[in-house]
Amino acid sequence: MNVLHQRSSNTREETPMSFSNFKVLTFDVVGTLIDFETGVLDAVRKISGRSAAELSDDKIFASYKRGRDAHPERSSEVMFDVYRYLAKELGLPADDAACDSFQLAVLRWQPFSDSVEALKRLRTKFRLVAMTNADRVALSCYAHALGDPFDDSVCADETGVAKPNPEFFAYNKGRQSAFGYKQSDILHVAQSQHHDIGIARKLGYKVCWIERRQGMAGFGGTPEVPVLTKPDFHFATMKAFADAAVGH
């Protein structure tokens, strides 16, 4: 049983709604469309070899999250320092070459297997906007890997803040309003309860939770939340979301 569903939700049931209510889909990128967890694990094990062979996924993720907390800057270059923190904590090689390798590996994180096709289908009906805590350098790599599906994008190095800061959402709201879209036109789509679903709901957005870890224990590489926010829509995959939103 997924431990997420053992916790209570802090929102009430919503009246069923149609996807036709929306014109804009705003997407979290890393974790929702890009499989950063596999990217982190593969990079750590490739760089460290036998030294990392006995480390569990959860142990690596725990050190990775502490490294992100210790180095909260949102430039892709900070991943050099995040890896050094992780490596020292886990007793792995922490030389400059290893840190450089991890930083470069971050820019090569790949999409989930269903992301590209789902976005291609969704773009036939909706305006697609990336809302990412990554910087512009990283997003350019991820967008290319995803087939360049976005009509617009907002990055943390442009907003000056990162999600879950409400100012990030305010920045995008203002940006989309310049194109004639209201908040009620927007459905926010994300995996992270911490960075996206909880705060977006509090700000009055309709939200779609892509629960990438459905059926898996714990929160993986994403920060934990004490209570889950109940979304307006809930799917385990982007394919299932696209099937519901635009049909098969």
Predicted regions and their residues:
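N-terminal helical cap/lid subdomain that shapes the substrate entry/recognition surface
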Residues: 19-113, 124, 137-138
